[in-house]
């Protein structure tokens, strides 16, 4: 499977370079990701349809960590320490990581909406966990239903294999 290999990093980077060099035209990275430049931003469409955006993309010659020169993408980002705006390289592995993390978020968000629709009180989420408030005597049956709801794939990924496990207690534990 392509997404289990480093090859997808290069595919993501190549699609991003193509998109920046051809504004307005969509470029596929694998079967589920599409990159396109519009309104001075590089957009990546996730399987859910949600978009991830990088500001002011440009194609430049970049120096790799091992000293080689190669064509790459830079984007306008804010330094997390100085809060100053600067240009930084956007490499294929970062593009793919954004796709993976964004898609994981979309799966969890869909599950939270399903839980809410089923009448559960979602009080928090922490990374890949959802915290619910249920009556103590309903803990076991609620956990079974919650796992069923959380492992039902969304319409945009009908064949995606989802797994979940759970526990219930009076207090949150890690």
Q: What role is predicted for each listed range?
A:
Residues 1-174:
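Conserved catalytic core of nucleotide polymerization and phosphodiester-bond processing enzymes
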